[in-house]
Amino acid sequence: VGIMLDDYESQMVSLTAGEEISFSLLNHGFSPDEVDARVKEALNDVGLPDRENYQLDELSGGQRQRLLLASVLATRPDILILDEPVSAMDPDGARSLYALVDRIHKAHGMTVVVVEHDLNYLLPYMTHMVLMETGKIKVQGPFEEAARRAFPQESLRANLPELWRIKLGLEAKY
């Protein structure tokens, strides 16, 4: 299981992009040759080729988030958990990151679990949804089914993507 927390800066431990990715690989016992290959592959996967020797402070916030994603992906987890991964990004950066995660999901076949307050960015990608309230699961299941069950509950309706609130509102009216 690979995890990327919302406070991505707190997960960074190295000076350069390459060292950041290498750190967890070396701790997992990979050989230096395997580490080098995985560092290059991971940087390529997240759209940061040739940034291996960049200092972390030379990277933008969005690039550092993608670097952290690369360091998680380099271990090739079966499950990737992202906790508010776009919290510090502008809308274009958020859409770009989720499109990247979708490409990686399809290329590597890993399960992706996203904890997110703004589901609008996830709409093109999500297949299942879990809505929680005060720490308890209120609705879960395939996305459309869960959205339809959540809509009548006012406290959950606000959490649905805007397009689905409009769609379900029109269906209820007509």
Language-model-derived ranges and their functions:
Residues L80-D83:
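Catalytic Walker B motif of ABC-type/P-loop ATPase nucleotide-binding domains
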Residues E116-H117:
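H-loop/switch region of ABC-family ATPase nucleotide-binding domains
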Residues Q55-L59:
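Conserved ABC ATPase signature
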Residues P91-G93:
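Helix N-cap at the start of a conserved alpha-helix in ABC-type nucleotide-binding domains
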Residues K136-L163:
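Conserved beta-strand-loop-alpha-helix hinge in the C-terminal portion
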Residues R76:
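Conserved catalytic motifs of ABC-family nucleotide-binding domains
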